[in-house]
């Protein structure tokens, strides 16, 4: 495979691997702080909502490679928070400096998602 993906949750990795019918991705259970790839092996690293492990990210991305990351916006999962908390709160969003990387562009992304069935329970279980 030309792509590798990992998550700390074995359940998330199993679910994603089941959906990968073409086996285009090599899936693994791993922490952001111990990425199972060689030094300077990645042309691009994409981090979605995981803890920032800047030193590890810099280790695996090739010189001149890209690091793309997504952080929760101010109203990320706000609907869940309205149900779960007496006083829902907005997230604080700030640009973060990652040693070894330069911020190229910041692109806000907004979308609404409706969840149903057992996915609702999963979403509540992972919401801080």
What residue spans do the PLM features occupy?
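A short acidic, Gly/Pro-enriched loop at the edge of an enzyme's catalytic core
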Residues: 33-45
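A generic structural signal for alpha->beta connector loops
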Residues: 2, 22-24, 64, 100-103
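A short, conserved alpha-helix within the catalytic core of class I
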Residues: 49-61
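Residues lining the SAM
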Residues: 43, 48-51, 70
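C-terminal helical/coil "lid" or tail adjacent to the Rossmann-like core of SAM-dependent
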Residues: 102-105, 114-128
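Short alpha-helix immediately C-terminal to the canonical SAM-binding loop
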Residues: 13-14, 54, 77
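Class I SAM-dependent methyltransferase SAM/SAH-binding core
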Residues: 1-35
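Conserved class I S-adenosyl-L-methionine
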Residues: 58, 66-99
